[in-house]
């Protein structure tokens, strides 16, 4: 960089040793090396920026030249190829739009079919359950309650132990339960 030979470098070192002394010479060398690194990095940054600007300028000039030539001055074969590409792009776009519309309609149809199938299966399952299990409609009459109590239905055999944990169960409600048991 500075075109300094070995003998000149030794001479600078000896002068620096005499002027600065052995204690300050290493600090001075580090400082000078830091300056040299900074100058080198600045020079490379400026060089890179200039080369990028030149490339950008060349690209802009070539774009201007291409615009000046215009598409009308292209060869007839190239113009035909460009037109064919445009037509094929339009055909592909139309095909994609048609396929998208078909897909959307088929998806909507499938959703409607699934909804109706679910509704039908729910209705069928409810009627199947009602057929298989004879559910009494409405409320039970007192006679039917008594009949179920004699058969030993677990829901009708509730005693005081079932209500003992309830804090609001009072003595009158316990008596009412016992009265119902006696009647049934």
Swiss-Prot record:
Keyword flag ATP-binding: no
HAMAP family: TatB
Molecular function in Gene Ontology: protein transmembrane transporter activity
Compartment list: Cell inner membrane
Species this chain originates from: Histophilus somni (strain 129Pt)
Recorded GO CC terms: TAT protein transport complex
Family, as annotated: Belongs to the TatB family.
Superkingdom to which the source organism belongs: Bacteria
Function according to Swiss-Prot or TrEMBL: Part of the twin-arginine translocation (Tat) system that transports large folded proteins containing a characteristic twin-arginine motif in their signal peptide across membranes. Together with TatC, TatB is part of a receptor directly interacting with Tat signal peptides. TatB may form an oligomeric binding site that transiently accommodates folded Tat precursor proteins before their translocation.
InterPro entries documented for this protein: TatB
Subunit structure: The Tat system comprises two distinct complexes: a TatABC complex, containing multiple copies of TatA, TatB and TatC subunits, and a separate TatA complex, containing only TatA subunits. Substrates initially bind to the TatABC complex, which probably triggers association of the separate TatA complex to form the active translocon.
Protein name, as recorded: Sec-independent protein translocase protein TatB
Record Gene3D superfamilies: 1.20.5.3310
Listed Acidic residues bias regions: 149-168
Taxonomy of the source species: Bacteria, Pseudomonadati, Pseudomonadota, Gammaproteobacteria, Pasteurellales
One biological process term in Gene Ontology: protein transport by the Tat complex
Membrane protein topology class: Single-pass membrane protein
Region annotation Disordered: where it falls in the sequence: 149-184
Entry keywords, A to Z: Cell inner membrane, Cell membrane, Membrane, Protein transport, Translocation, Transmembrane, Transmembrane helix, Transport
Bilayer-spanning residue ranges: 1-21
